[in-house]
Curated annotation (Swiss-Prot):
The keyword Metal-binding is annotated on this UniProt entry: no
Lineage top rank: taxon: Bacteria
Pfam assignment, any one: MlaE
Name of this protein: Probable ABC transporter permease protein RBE_1340
Length: 259
């Protein structure tokens, strides 16, 4: 009994170590491919549109209603302590520091991460990845590099736009539903907002973009055989990306705002 338990733990530990090593080598190969030609500008532009532009409606809707709900809930709580004047500040700081980057990251992970994993996984199953080797093409450079670069570039842009739209959602609720004075609300919005609040959110966005793209590409690149393998790769990409987004969000927050 004890021998079986020890054997099971040993196998899982070895499997985990192998996965970490394989992922580290894969990530290093993707990063070092940046300095090697060709740069595949056409593929990068295509991924910029796919990851950035086509994700904008989802991110905009998410952040808009998050800002609106945040203003509404803050009013419900702060009115008990006659602190309604702090609502605008809470909305803008919550969005720029935390909600904007995290919500955008989770939405992009669900939309883009699943698509990338399914695309590369299907190419692996249908032996298109092997065909790239026969054509003397670096498959990681061709498949992974454009997606990673595009995700790192577009995520901060999406978060910045999402922050503005989220603050707008809070403004509309605050002014037109809660009857705040427009100029007073705007003054409170920017009174305590500092550059570090926005910068920290943009740094998070860039890190989230790298996490989403590299994990999704890795999951698809090493997907199992058949439709079941592609399905597992897709699920793994979304779940692992989401978990690492939340973990890295805490670590970056700790780095920028040491308490």
């Amino acid at each position: 009994m004890l021998l079986n338990i020890a054997n099971s733990i040993g196998k899982r530990t070895i499997r985990l170590a192998q996965s970490i090593g394989k992922f580290s080598i894969f990530s290093l190969a993707a990063i070092t491919s940046i300095i090697r030609p060709p740069l595949y500008f056409s593929l990068i532009i295509k991924q910029l549109l796919f990851i950035g532009f086509y994700s904008l409606p989802v991110v905009a809707m998410t952040t808009f209603f998050s800002g609106a709900v945040l203003a509404l809930q803050s009013y419900t709580g702060f009115s008990r302590f006659s602190a309604e004047s702090s609502i605008a500040t809470v909305v803008v700081l919550s969005l720029t520091r935390e909600l904007g980057p995290v919500l955008a990251g989770l939405m992009v992970a669900g939309r883009v991460g699943a698509s990338i994993a399914a695309e590369i996984g299907t190419m692996r199953v249908t032996e298109q990845v092997d065909a790239l080797y026969t054509l003397s093409t670096d498959s990681i450079k061709y498949l992974v590099f454009p997606k990673v670069i595009a995700a790192i570039i577009t995520m901060p842009c999406l978060v910045l736009i999402g922050d503005v739209i989220g603050v707008m959602g809070g403004y509309l609720v605050g002014v037109y539903k809660l009857d705040f004075n427009s100029s007073t609300y705007l003054t409170s919005t920017f009174q305590y907002l500092e550059p570090i609040d926005v910068i920290s959110g943009l740094v998070k966005a860039g890190v989230f973009g790298f996490i989403i793209s590299i994990i999704s590409c890795y999951s698809g690149y090493y997907s199992g055989k058949g439709a079941k393998g592609v399905g597992r790769a897709t699920t793994s990409a979304v779940v692992n990306s989401s978990i690492l987004i939340l973990i890295s969000n805490y670590l970056i927050t700790e780095l920028f705002f040491k308490v």
